[in-house]
Regions:
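N-terminal soluble domains immediately following signal/targeting peptides that reside
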Residues: 28-137
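Sec-dependent bacterial lipoprotein signal peptides
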Residues: 1-26
Length: 137
């Protein structure tokens, strides 16, 4: 059996130290955003009669006490319930009283899942999903 020798021990030590440094950096890295489950989310489409084509989504964020939540960053992802479709991605713009709007296009009839992801001003995050059914024209 071959001996490691000094050079082999140095390499092994260097690798070990490198692994420890990487693990410590990952463990001590940036602050993780804390999820929130006390923010209410509602989504409506304007016009209310959903059909294939352009619409405006209105996303309303409310605190647990019912107050509107302003200052959030809101992203919307629309996916068909079946595989093979390209998702529709939008950034919602802030409006009045915790209402955020996003232009959106229902690209085809069928069942859709809208995922709303938001980051509050204090860094907490949340995700809610909503089902929409778009009728065949």
């Amino acid at each position: 059996m071959a001996k490691w020798g000094r050079q082999g021990n140095r390499r092994l030590t260097a690798v070990f130290i490198g692994v420890v440094v990487v693990l410590l950096a990952a463990a001590c890295g940036g602050r993780q955003n804390q999820p929130t489950n006390d923010t209410g989310v509602a989504v409506t489409a304007q016009p209310a009669a959903t059909a294939v084509g352009e619409t405006e989504l209105r996303i309303t964020l409310t605190a647990a006490d019912g107050r509107p939540v302003s200052g959030a960053a809101v992203q919307v992802r629309g996916d068909m319930s079946h595989a093979g479709m390209v998702p529709v991605l939008r950034t919602a713009l802030p409006g009045d009283a915790g209402v955020y709007t996003a232009p959106f296009e229902w690209t085809m009839a069928g069942d859709w899942v809208l995922t709303v992801e938001f980051t509050l001003a204090d860094g907490r995050t949340g995700t809610e999903t909503f089902d929409f059914s778009i009728p065949t024209p």
